[in-house]
């Protein structure tokens, strides 16, 4: 129920009627003059995808009832992301995170589609971003926040989804203050179609700070999302890394 259709005069393109299906799935127009018309779905029922394929109908004699049928596909919304990285690191070493399965798995387009990496700022400093590539041609941008500025700023813009970039994201490249560092960055695509997904895998390179204590651990969180019909569709992935702790020598007990 509640699927809406608009009926247009075929020749003039004028809207002549708007109809809505009842509980039985049937919608009936008011009596229309003889002629040719185009029926277009304008609003799908809840949990179903919109199909704007026009249906041509013709009323050839007075009182004629013209029947048409349309089947909508059930709507499915889902996004995904998976993040992995090193299990164990040493203070001061470089750390790489790998991303897989970044996708809009929905049967419909999503707006404001993004994926984001929230860095464990107490443990790492962002160095480089390998962007990866995606299966649909388009442009996107990368924005970031820092410990001194909670507003998003543009890191790189007008990037192509079909080109793989290695981007310098170090504090010096971005002109950050001496005590400023990136706490999160977001890759923002805008509108993406259903089945939009990564091809080459994105990777993020960070430097582990030198003052971490052996035996501690830190968590990096990535998330992905997009909007359908005013609702956010989201997913999250986390990865835990330990800081290596050298084995303490056993006390000598003999000679």
Language-model features: where?
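Solvent-exposed loop/turn and edge beta-strand elements of beta-rich ligand-binding domains
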Residues: 1-255
């Amino acid at each position: 129920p509640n699927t809406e259709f608009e009926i247009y005069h075929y020749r003039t393109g004028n809207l002549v009627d708007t109809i809505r299906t009842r509980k039985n799935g049937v919608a009936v127009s008011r009596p229309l003059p003889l002629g040719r018309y185009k029926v277009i779905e304008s609003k799908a029922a809840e949990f179903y995808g919109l199909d704007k394929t026009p249906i041509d109908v013709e009323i050839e004699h007075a009182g004629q009832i013209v029947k048409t049928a349309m089947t909508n596909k059930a709507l499915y919304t889902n996004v995904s992301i998976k993040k992995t990285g090193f299990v164990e690191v040493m203070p001061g070493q470089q750390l790489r995170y790998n991303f897989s399965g970044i996708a809009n798995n929905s049967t419909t387009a999503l707006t404001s589609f993004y994926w984001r990496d929230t860095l464990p700022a107490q443990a790492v400093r962002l160095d480089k971003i390998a962007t990866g590539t995606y299966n649909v041609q388009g442009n996107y941008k990368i924005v970031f926040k820092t410990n001194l500025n909670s507003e998003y700023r543009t890191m790189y813009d007008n990037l192509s989804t079909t080109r793989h970039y290695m981007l310098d994201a170090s504090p010096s490249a971005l002109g950050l203050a001496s005590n400023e560092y990136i706490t999160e960055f977001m890759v923002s695509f805008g509108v993406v179609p259903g089945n939009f997904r990564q091809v080459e895998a994105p990777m993020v390179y960070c430097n582990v700070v030198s003052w971490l204590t052996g035996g501690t651990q830190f968590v990096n969180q990535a998330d992905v999302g997009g909007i359908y019909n005013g609702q956010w569709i989201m997913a999250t992935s986390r990865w835990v890394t330990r800081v290596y702790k050298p084995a303490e020598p056993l006390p000598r007990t003999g000679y």
